[in-house]
Amino acid sequence: MNFWNNFAAKHPAAAKWVREGGLFVIVSNLITVFKYLLLQFLPKAFASLPVVDFGWPGIDITLFGETFKWNILGYDAAHGGLPYFCAYMIAMVIGECINFPIQRNFVFRSKGNLAKQIGWYVLAFCVITCIVNSINCIWMAVAGLFVPAFIYNIGTVVLNGGISMVIFFFVNKIIFPEGAQAK
C-alpha cells in the first residue's frame, strides 16, 4: 500500500487513470460474465418466436463455405434470427443497466447531469452495439461451423465486452467527469 500511496502522491493524474482503468476492467468483465450467463438461457425464452431473418442490411456473404447475411443489427435465421436477436439485445441492455450506475458512481465518481449522461451513454451504446454486432454476425456464422453454441456465446460476449470495454472507457471518461455537477 505504501508504494501505491507514494505513487498517487507523486503522480495523481496517472494514479487516477490506473484506479479508474483497473476498476473499469473488473466491473466490465463481471458484467460480461453476467451477459454470458443470460445468453445461456434467454434464447430458449424466445423459442416461440418465428426463426426468421431479422436484421439490416442483410447482405449475403460467404466465408469458409458458409453463406450468411451480414447485418449491422440483427441476425439471419440460420444464426438465431429474431429469437436470438431478442435474447442478445435483452442481455446487453440488462448488462448496461447494471453497468451504468456502477461505472458512473463507483468507478468514475461522477456527480454530473444524470439525464445528459444517460442520453450520451444510450447513444454510445447504440453506436457500439451496431459496430460490435456487425462483427459478431460474422463471428457467429464462422464459429458456428466449428464449435457448439455455448462456446461461440463465450466469443460473442468476449467480443462484445472487449470492443465495448475499450470504446466505453474513453466515452465514460468524457461523459462521467469526476466531482460535483457544474451549475
What are these regions (language model features)?
Residues 1-183:
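Alpha-helical membrane-protein topology signature
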